[in-house]
Amino acid sequence: MLKKKINVSVLGATGIVGQNYISLLDNHPWFNVVDVAASKHSSGKKFYDAVKAKWFLKNNIPAKVRDIIVRDVFDFESIPPGVSCVFSAMSLSSKEDTRRLEFEYAQRGFALISNDSANRFTDDVPMIIPEINPHHADVIPIQQKNRSLPSTGFVAVKPNCSIQAYIVVIDALIKAGFKPIEISVTTLQALSGAGKAGLENIDLRENVIPYIQGEEEKTEIEPLKIFGSVSKKGIKNFTDLKISALCTRVPVIDGHTAIVSLNFLNDSLN
């Protein structure tokens, strides 16, 4: 356990992903939430007042953050002193705007860990699953040099939520000496993955939607970056694997399912 917890900020704290961040970080052994930020619509309110009518989780709003005043995500001057790490669940109107916002925090010396997809395909931004590719953090000095960032500032991202369970198994097979060359995956993704709008859409509750915009591209490309290698210019994608994906939205509140088939280089796994 750390002698002193790391003070953190949560961006997009009033949304579904942000609420999960707040819940997961409550009483965390490493992190202490001292700042929450969101859009202008929520800024200036106590966190409790901003989320009480739309709190998604079954557990109560953590007491430690209830009275924190929500900061506008663009109000950098109001970030409390001592904050060194930022967890971002913020999605702006365009991916380019989100990319700029994330690097603005990095430029100001903050380590920003993003849940958004805006920077997942940025070559010098690591997309890390700790059990698989912690060494991709080695690209951070390259990112800092490329973008003239201070020594404490960088952007790192997590991958798409629907791939996180099965990709760990695929990684274990690769490390055990097996060589998958083709992967076919069908995802059954919960309504919560579409945010508040997905949960409130009555039509979605009784239907299976056979297409989710952008999800198939993420599912097919993100694992190649995770299995990739660090080069002098950034992350070089793994090239010896072909992934084909079909992503569907199903009437389940929370929790994704994936049906995965693999073809291996050798006919036998013995």
Regions found by a protein language model. Name each.
Residues M1-P210, K242, N266:
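N-terminal Rossmann-like NAD(P) cofactor-binding subdomain of oxidoreductases
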Residues K179, L191-N270:
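Charged docking surfaces used in two-component/phosphorelay signaling
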